[in-house]
Amino acid sequence: MRNVIVLIDSGYLGAASCIILSNWGAAWGTWKSGIGLCSMGVNHPGGIIKNLVAIIMAGVLGIYGLIVAIIISGGISKPAYDKNTYSEFTGWAHMAAGLCCGLCNLAAGGATGIAGEYGIKATGHRAELNHAKNNKNMMGNVSSEVGDEGDAARLYIGSVTILSFSGAIGLYGFILSLIITSSDAYECV
């Protein structure tokens, strides 16, 4: 009976680690990106809505963890009268799937948060500089600087590209966890 409890615990530990680590990564990414958004919003409030992408991408990581944790906990079978119905292979597979998804989402949350914070700040700063330069030129002053009006847009596209690749880390863990949990479960003999 003790082996049965240990095996079931490894499955539930996989589900718990998946949801905890994934939401930790989502919270980390939201926190860091939110700092950048608040900082940028002071000087360039017009860019707040389009720069919500980093926060939304960080929140998706928590959803990945929730989905995998539900699948894992649904695959855990209860023991029946001293008979083990949950194999050791399945227990460790559930543990591996939970850790894979959770740790990948934790890493993706950190990458999304850091890239999001600095990308948002840089985009807002560049847009503010372009706006100030346009106002200066409209007042009749000739600027000696030759600037490109598309700098802020190019910087934003680059930032979103970096965020997409950092979010892909979490997606890879999510897909691998789904593959691991969908593998054939061995029945106990």
Identify the residue ranges that each predicted region occupies:
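Hydrophobic, small-residue-rich transmembrane alpha-helices and their short perimembrane loops
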Residues: M1-V189
